[in-house]
Amino acid sequence: RQAVVDGRQLIKIAQRAGYRKISVLGISLGSWVAGLIAAHDPAVDKASLLLTGGDLAEMVWTGGAMRHIRASLDGKIELSDLRRAWAPLNLESYVGKLARPALDVQILLATRDRVVLPTVSERLVQRLEGAGTSLNVERLNCGHYSLTLPPYIITTGMRASRFLSR
């Protein structure tokens, strides 16, 4: 919650400084924050969400890099209860707000991601498409962490730059 509040405050500061086109970009967990900011702040024109997914609970439950978190939850909470508790953090809860006409959304996902499984990302994409979101989806044949390495980081940077500058 605090990250979204802080992000919205930064948008107000940028607007007071004269900026009229506001974009947000986030990678991995930061893409959830950027998506939540875009969903809740109508001043955002573009959102570039890299390595994102819609269901944070499922990402923690199924992602290989999240095993230690999952282990701490085992026997204490079921996935359905975690989903309910974390619903305010799930981008899938805000598909309608992300589908507003004045917002363009880019999603870049890694087809071999073991942190945010492609099924988690693709379900968000399907829901956004179903809601009529202005959506640009890019799929790279890499994993979550290899996105930060050449040539993927170069390709990703160029795609995000093109999207945000148009």
Residue spans of the language-model regions?
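Alpha/beta-hydrolase active-site loop
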Residues: R1-A17
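Alpha/beta-hydrolase fold nucleophile elbow
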Residues: R16-I27
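Short glycine-enriched nucleophile-adjacent loop
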Residues: S31-P42, A47
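Active-site nucleophile loop of the alpha/beta-hydrolase fold
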Residues: S48-E58
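The feature captures the conserved acid-bearing segment of alpha/beta-hydrolase catalytic domains
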Residues: M59-V120
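C-terminal catalytic histidine-bearing segment of alpha/beta-hydrolase fold enzymes
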Residues: E122, E129-R166
